[in-house]
UniProtKB/Swiss-Prot annotation:
An annotated GO BP: stress-induced homeostatically regulated protein degradation pathway
Family named by the database record: Belongs to the peptidase S1C family.
Native organism taxonomy: Eukaryota, Fungi, Dikarya, Ascomycota, Saccharomycotina
Entry protein name: Pro-apoptotic serine protease NMA111
Keywords, ordered alphabetically: Apoptosis, Hydrolase, Nucleus, Protease, Repeat, Serine protease
GO cellular-component term (any): nucleus
Gene expressing this chain: NMA111
Region Disordered, annotated ranges: 1-29
Top-level taxon of origin: Eukaryota
Gene3D superfamilies for the chain: 2.30.42.10, 2.40.10.120, Trypsin-like serine proteases (2.40.10.10)
Residue stretches making up the PDZ domain: 279-364, 878-950
Comp. bias regions, Polar residues: 11-28
């Protein structure tokens, strides 16, 4: 019978069942999707919560609890980075002091974690102490943290004695811990079982095995992981580890092995751990009989162990392990070295003392008793204690934990964070087994390091890999090795003395990129039976595929990789127009692909601030192909006009269709208020009622002779309410709206001096205008000149000015009548703003006609040119998408993103907020922020004052962690447009 769903007891009771991965959402600090609710969760309880049954001996329990709480601590911790089965998290748990003199705290292994750990503990009197991990068991769910005992000055820390032999069925117990994120909660229960198999928390996560678990009904929830399970005398008989998500059942780890490990630490002895890579399961005698246990063997076992109900049976045997081919699944364990076996406890005792030795193992298989001699392996040797960061991804040696889940050999290179160049899937970041890189085998981590050393930067290489959940399927992929943005190539090694992971740089700089050579490509014309459309056949020669890699989550752009199509607007000089959905900013690596054959790098040279397109430049000398720029029309499309659509659909397949323009509309793409980013504004868009066109992210509208009338672009819009998906809009941008820029590009001139009105306008009906005060004489004037739709333009939003700029005189609700003496009918009538320092408007405001002069804003300052990485937060000046949605900017230090597991995450720096002060020193911009943090030492608490996106101020404290999250900057050279990394030496 399968186990019922089980869960860990971490910070907020997040359920980790046997069909889903662990979900760590700390009640201490809200996760990214919770950030809009505030900075920190409220600690609603400063007083102990006594949730226990009142019995006749309640006075005894009261005395016991009074002593126990002085040894129990709340652990606030973070797993800094992905490693092995665990992802980077911030969470909260419980531990208890087991050696007050040495400052040793016992907690769960899934709290200590297999990888980098940072944390502190809070005692009952709210004294705080930094802790470091000194031991995490390779298999069983326990580990030890250590604090400086001298740092606790205002209370006498007591320690709990570990008494595993006092755990009996029927024993009344208390679980004393940080239940459901409360400071202290005391839960009552009775032990109901001592021989439960270890709970299963699912694949690709940590699981305990080869040990009995104690079962009780205490209804513990999140944050209670690591709580002591004490008896009436105040002895710790077990440690809280997990529980059922469908019942009040809790699972406790017996403290036999923690007690042994504690004694080894106290005696400065190594904690040896032996194993033969076999998972055993405790099965009742009736099932053992069905699997081949003889009646005589059962009789002997029942006589030897009258209180036991079964024996250990091999559940799985790992290939290439010490017991491979010697023990089979279904074998019943009888004895080890002539020692009869009935419990996991005895197996652990024997194996832990026999590492490297050969032992005689007796099993029963199919009614036959078999004796095997097996060499005992070292569990620590198959537990990874190092990882490699390179090209934005992280790798470690295959672990026993992962291998056991899928019954595979404990060997190979495991990708614990498939990001950067090794991002195979947006949804699956872990579980990948790397087999070859650049056609070279990578059987282990050291070989992988040597292979990566030989790969030049910007090189495309072929890799093969599998996912451990589907080892039958080998995947092959060409990836781009990027090491100029993410230059880190380092080895991290665990140091149990310091509690840190020591970093060693493997290669300061990658090998330089290989020289590019010209390559041939052949375009195949679009086949048409209709002779009248033969002019459109060669339009395929104007399309190029554009692949974008955005290494830094700048400007709140949600994607790292994008693929779309652009149109060559100048084949002689090498210019491509593409949607800003695919090229959001200029901190990108761009690849331009011709005829799906030739791949050359591109560079962003122009980003239009309103109209949702970017211009990319490539070197035309590197492409030996018949690349053609189309002929561009000088007449705008009109409603009802027929055209021919050529575009690329979701599958990047070329499609065509005859279409009719359904409308020309003045509009703005809806904003993503919870995550502001670039969007098209003040657009005059071509609309089509075509299902096929709405399936295409890129394309063109053309006349039958091939003359281009409109670019078909995709526009990134608002997020759905669940913040998991983004809305995309697909509309046309008339060629005439781009002709001025295209003509400049033909002269190799980049329009860097573009200016805009920093406001958004929307169309309103004549009726709305009349109601809001537009006089009849102006309505008559509009009726004379409007030939398609009668409408006014009204101010919908006014962007917040920068701190050194004068506020825009336009106000929301202003109705535009004329600009520089000409009537404003559509968005196109505002095009004169692009080269004017100011514009003279006649407007209606509050039913009054007035004249105002509105200065325009130069657009080069709208693009981000400075990014700061500090304590896991990514900071920049508020980008244009932010200012468009705000009336006033609190500071020009904007938190655009934060890394999971960093101080920013742990202490509650919220994305989309502004840092206004550091230690009460004002930080108006990034330069003043850098000045404020320069003299702040590592592992130091600092006070930050922040203002949320909704202008709610808050003050928090953040502890710096420069070891794992060093300070760095990226700055753009305004002359060359190149980005340069600036590293900072921390104090």
């Amino acid at each position: 019978m399968p186990d019922i769903p089980t869960k860990r007891r971490l910070s907020n009771g997040s359920v980790i069942d046997n069909t889903n991965k662990r979900q760590m959402q700390s009640s201490f600090v809200p996760e990214v999707e919770q950030e809009s609710d505030g900075y920190l969760s409220e600690d609603s309880s400063d007083q102990p919560i006594f949730d226990m049954a009142v019995a006749a001996n309640s006075n005894q329990w009261q005395e016991t609890i009074t002593k126990v709480v002085k040894s129990v601590v709340s652990i606030q911790f973070t797993h800094v980075s992905n490693f092995d089965t665990e992802s980077s998290i911030v969470s909260e748990a419980t531990g208890f002091v087991v050696d007050a003199k040495r400052g040793l705290i016992l907690t769960n292994r899934h709290v200590v974690g297999p990888g980098p750990f940072c944390g502190y503990v809070v005692f009952d009197n709210h004294e705080e102490a930094v802790v470091k991990p000194i031991y995490r068991d390779p298999v069983h769910d326990f580990g030890f943290l250590q604090f400086d005992a001298k740092s606790i000055k205002y209370m006498d820390v007591t320690q709990l004695e570990l008494k595993p032999d006092l755990a009996k069925v029927g024993t009344e117990i208390r679980v004393v811990g940080n239940d459901a994120g409360e400071k202290l909660s005391i839960l009552a229960g009775f032990i109901s079982r001592l021989d439960r198999n270890a709970p299963d928390y699912g694949a690709l996560t940590y699981n305990d095995f080869n040990t009995e678990y104690i079962q009780a009904a205490a209804s513990a929830s999140g944050g209670s992981s690591g709580s002591p399970v004490v008896n009436e005398d105040g002895h710790a008989v077990a440690i809280q580890a997990g529980g059922s998500s469908e019942a009040s059942t809790d699972f406790f780890l017996p403290v036999y092995r923690p007690l042994r490990a504690l004694r080894c630490i106290q005696e400065s002895q190594p904690i040896t751990r032996g194993d033969i890579q076999v998972e055993w399961s405790l099965k009742p005698f009736d099932e053992c009989r069905r699997l081949g246990l003889t009646s005589e063997a059962e009789r002997i076992a029942r006589e030897r162990f009258p209180d036991k109900i079964g024996l250990l049976v091999a559940e799985l045997v790992l290939p290439e392990g010490p017991a491979d081919e010697l023990i089979k699944e279904g074998d019943t364990l009888i004895s080890i070295n002539d020692e009869p076996i009935s419990t996991f406890i005895k197996v652990d005792e024997i194996l832990d003392e026999s590492v490297g030795k050969e032992l005689k193992v007796v099993i029963q298989r199919g009614g036959e008793e078999i004796t095997q001699t097996i060499k005992i392996g070292d569990l620590h040797s198959i537990t990874p204690d190092r990882y490699v960061d390179v090209a934005g991804a992280s790798f470690n040696q295959m672990s026993y934990q992962v291998a056991r889940c899928y019954c595979i050999p404990v060997k190979g290179v495991y990708i614990n964070d498939a990001s950067g160049s090794f991002e195979f899937s947006t949804f699956e970041k872990t579980g990948w087994l790397l087999e070859t890189v650049d056609d070279k085998q990578t059987p282990d981590l050291d070989t992988f390091i040597e292979v990566m050393k030989q790969i030049p930067d910007r090189q495309k290489v072929t890799i093969t890999y599998r996912h451990v959940s589907d080892l039958h399927t080998e995947s092959i992929q060409v990836i781009y090795i990027e090491r100029h943005w993410q230059s880190t190539f380092r080895l991290a090694v665990r140091n149990d003395k310091s509690g840190l992971w020591d970093f060693t740089d493997i290669q300061d700089k990658p090998l330089p990129p290989l020289k590019l050579e010209p390559q041939n490509a052949k375009y195949i014309n679009i086949p048409f039976e209709n002779e009248e459309k033969q002019g459109c056949a060669s339009l395929v020669k104007s399309f190029v595929q554009v692949r974008t890699v955005a290494p830094v989550p700048m400007d709140s752009y949600p994607y790292r990789k994008e693929i779309g199509y652009g149109v060559v607007v100048d084949a002689t000089n090498g210019y491509v127009l593409v949607s800003r959905r695919f090229v959001p900013h200029d901190m990108c690596d761009i690849f331009v692909i011709f005829a799906e054959s030739v791949d050359i790098p591109g560079k962003v040279v122009f980003l239009h601030p309103n109209q949702n397109y970017a211009i990319i430049k490539y070197d035309p000398k590197l492409v030996l192909a018949d690349v053609q720029a189309p002929k561009f029309s000088d007449k705008p499309l009109k409603r009802g006009e027929k055209s021919f659509f050529v575009g690329y659909n979701y599958n990047l397949r070329l499609v065509t269709e005859d279409v009719k323009v359904s409308g020309i509309s003045s509009l703005n793409v809806p904003a993503a208020s919870l995550s502001p980013r670039y969007r098209g504004t003040n657009l005059e868009c071509v609309l089509l009622d075509s299902k096929l066109c709405q399936e295409c992210d890129s394309g063109v509208l053309a006349d039958e002779d091939g003359t281009l009338r409109s670019f078909w672009l995709s526009y990134l819009g608002e997020s759905n309410c669940d913040q998991t998906t983004d809305r995309m809009y697909r509309m046309g941008l008339d060629v005439t709206d781009v002709l001025d820029v295209i003509n400049k590009l033909k002269d190799n001139e980049i329009p860097v001096d573009l200016r805009i009105l920093d406001a958004e306008f929307s169309s309103i009906t004549i009726l709305q205008g009349r109601t809001r005060g537009v006089p009849q004489k102006w309505i008559n004037e509009f009726e004379k000149v409007c030939h398609d739709e009668l409408k006014f333009l009204s101010v919908e939003r006014v962007a917040a000015a920068k701190l050194n700029q004068t506020p825009n005189p336009l106000k929301i609700g202003d109705i535009l009548l004329s600009v520089n003496g000409s009537i404003v009918k559509t968005m196109r009538d505002l095009k004169i703003m692009y080269n004017k320092p100011s514009l003279d408007f006649k407007i209606i405001r509050s039913k009054k006609e007035m004249d105002i002069t509105v200065p325009t804003v130069e657009t080069t300052s709208l693009n981000t040119s400075h990014v700061v990485f500090w304590c896991g937060a990514i900071l920049q000046a508020p980008h244009h998408g932010v200012r468009q949605l705000m009336e006033k900017i609190p500071s020009e230090v904007y938190v655009t993103r934060k890394n999971s597991g960093g101080p920013a995450h742990q202490y509650g720096i919220v994305t989309n907020s502004f840092i206004t002060h550091v230690n009460d020193k004002e930080t108006k911009n990034l330069e003043s922020f850098m000045d404020a943090i320069t003299d702040i030492a590592d592992n130091t608490y600092i006070k930050l004052r922040l203002v949320s996106f909704d202008n709610v101020p808050v003050a928090i404290s953040v502890k710096t962690n420069y070891h794992y999250f060093p300070t760095a900057e990226l700055k753009k050279n305004k002359e060359t447009g190149e980005w340069k990394e600036i590293e900072h030496k921390e104090k």
